[in-house]
Amino acid sequence: MFSSDEVDEKVPVFSDNRVNYILVYSGSFNPPHIGHLNFMRESLAHAGHDLHIVGALFDPRSDDWLRSHKNSDLILPHTTRSRMLLEDKRVSTGVWRSPERDGIAKFKLLAQNYGVRVRFLRLLSAETDTGLDDRSGKWSKDFDGILLNTYGRHSSGTFSIPSLSKDPWNTLHEPGDAVYRYQRMVTNDRGTILGFLRVITRGPDEKTSLISSSGVKSLAKVIDAKEMECSNLLREIVLGWSTLEVDETWAKWRAVQMHNRNAPEFREAKGTLEKSMKDAWELEKRNCHDE
């Protein structure tokens, strides 16, 4: 993974005769956790061999975006969230994080310098409302396509196999594939093609992921410093835990929570939250083991 200063020194293996795709996963990552990483891994594994994907990019939302869109009493700084993604050794060297000021523009310039064709794919989960059928909506000029993966947040009403098996969808998967892949073009109200939407899914057998950033914060509210030090649960689930431990915003937030920790509702919630997080972590490990 690259820091913003390393991006010009370490580059992916580009192809001269193919379009080189970079998968961009934008999100709050407040904080980043193993569920985010597994979603990225699963998407890269099953995107399809016809897409020459040379790398992937974690793109944390800005602090201002989080403050205006998320109702949270903890907003970790963009620099902290990026450093956490950069630090964790479970994130492969082919996955980068986006600097806040430059975004993917830095990577576009890199491609131009190497004289190769690079395109960007936006990675979304099934819980995201893409608004693609609202033809008055805007398609981001930075992206040639959207890869929507139902892994982890699947529901029976989300992109069912029967609905994907009809026009205007094209079937891309082959016999023996671990997932189903379908694709259709997206147009504006004038009929101009904006890009493609590809869905990868296991249908009714889709795997479930229960780990969430809000769940991490809820558990962190009810355990004290000694309990947190003795437990490996959050250390295993959160990406870049050692960076989070020394973050000033996190420390101040934790101090406020410790002041309230002895309230009856906190004590009652502790056991339930710990069990829920342990169950979610075991499920996440089974998901990875099955691949």
Language-model regions, residue ranges each:
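Nucleotidyltransferase catalytic core that binds NTPs
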Residues: 1-291
